[in-house]
Amino acid sequence: MKDPRDIIKRPIITENTMNLVGQRKYTFEVDVKANKTEVKDAVEKIFGVKVEKVNIMNYKGKFKRVGRYSGYTNRRRKAIVTLTPDSKEIELFEV
């Protein structure tokens, strides 16, 4: 089993994700090979909360060119984690 801190890379804090915090939904960038159960277990272990469900989105790398060299940026994976109503909040996202 992977270390939970290898699965969850960083929180995504934008205006849109801060609006979702009121609905008990928290957004993280996760490892591209992590599945929903791994993300759920990692969030529960790191933050000590109860997770109700996990939604995951994949983003492909964008094409970039610098002079005559071209390539793609790294692909990413984003997870929106919904907490149960009786769970405590994650302090990282407090305003």
Curated annotation (Swiss-Prot):
GO terms for molecular function: rRNA binding; structural constituent of ribosome. One of its GO terms (cellular component) is ribonucleoprotein complex. InterPro entries: Nucleotide-bd_a/b_plait_sf, Ribosomal_uL23-like, Ribosomal_uL23/eL15/eS24_sf, Ribosomal_uL23_CS. Keywords: Ribonucleoprotein, Ribosomal protein, RNA-binding, rRNA-binding. Gene3D superfamilies: 3.30.70.330. It comes from the Bacteria. One of its GO terms (biological process) is translation. The keyword Chaperone does not apply. Belongs to the universal ribosomal protein uL23 family. PANTHER family: 60S RIBOSOMAL PROTEIN L23A (PTHR11620). One of the early assembly proteins it binds 23S rRNA. One of the proteins that surrounds the polypeptide exit tunnel on the outside of the ribosome. Forms the main docking site for trigger factor binding to the ribosome. Part of the 50S ribosomal subunit. Contacts protein L29, and trigger factor when it is bound to the ribosome. This is Large ribosomal subunit protein uL23. The gene is rplW.
